[in-house]
Amino acid sequence: MELNKNLIIPFAKQAGLTSFASMSAVKKALSTKKVGHTGTLDLFADGLLVLLTGQLTRLADIISAEKKTYEAWVEFGTETDTLDPEGEPVLTAPLPSYKNLTESIPSFLGKILQRPPEFSAIKINGKRASDRIRSGEKIKIAEREIEIFKIELKGIITDSGLEFTEKDFTNINAELKIRYAHIVVECSKGTYIRSLVRDLARKASSCAYVRALRRTAVGNFKLEDAAGFDLLNNFSAAPENLFLKEKKILDAAAGKKFYKQKEIDFLEIMAKSIIFSPKTAENLKLPYLFLDRKYLNDFYNGKKIKFNWFLNTDEVLENITGLDLENKKTCVFCGDLWIGIIGLNKNCPKYETVIKN
């Protein structure tokens, strides 16, 4: 039986592997090279990658625009050049108190300007910022607007090694010095947790870097539903499971070190795969329209789109705010068949992608 190669695959990336390299297991399982993802994770990070195969790679812009949720372990008192455990220390500062840290958090909620890390995949004149830095260039990355919906402090470890979880915070000594903090962040597309941690620590009169990072959700996709989730370490069990450069092992034949990865079973990849349908779009809360079948040829032939072609236009427009209604990318189905994506706006919807099945 031929495998369906048009799938959505929630996939658990392991720390120490690039997002691109992580896709190799899926490419091998489906015998295809046409696999994309909806948002890169740093090398040291683990967690959810939403992979798209075949024609569904065209959904990347829609899914990547969804909110993201992360868990992070923050180490205070040191800042590295990369703001992660792969970098070299460039700054030290006193540890923040519990009071300073918790009072600093509200400053970062809502829409804020954030300067991305210099060591990042952001392109400057066609070349990654991180590559320019490593080649000795001095660069300056402009601030960009992001939105932080939630920052929760889940646990702390003090300078003396005492551990507290959120249930202990009611009666905690506000002057305790914090070495590590476990936080959960819900944020918009384009947010860098490394930058957030840098700025939060400085606001609390300290400095910090992200010791470990895990993405737990992309929109309604959840990490616990991903292929390979059971292979990830318990993120709450700090610090023994935190990402460390020392976890690299030597490949004597190649003469270099690498991060050992756990194999993901082919059957699990297939079991976790999702076929795209109106029900899938509904469950994932992705915007979608039903095209009246009598306009299918008009749609396929690229005629000017009219709102009366669709059966549920009013319902969709009611759920999109005025601010969002500027080329809001929306999936189009004819019955159960996905036939494309349009840019939805108040005046003239436009074609983004047409899938001729």
UniProtKB/Swiss-Prot annotation:
This is tRNA pseudouridine synthase B. The keyword Isomerase applies. InterPro entries: PsdUridine_synth_cat_dom_sf, PsdUridine_synth_N, tRNA_psdUridine_synth_TruB. It comes from the Bacteria. It holds the Pfam family TruB_N. It comes from Treponema denticola (strain ATCC 35405 / DSM 14222 / CIP 103919 / JCM 8153 / KCTC 15104). GO terms for molecular function: RNA binding; tRNA pseudouridine(55) synthase activity. One of its GO terms (biological process) is mRNA pseudouridine synthesis.
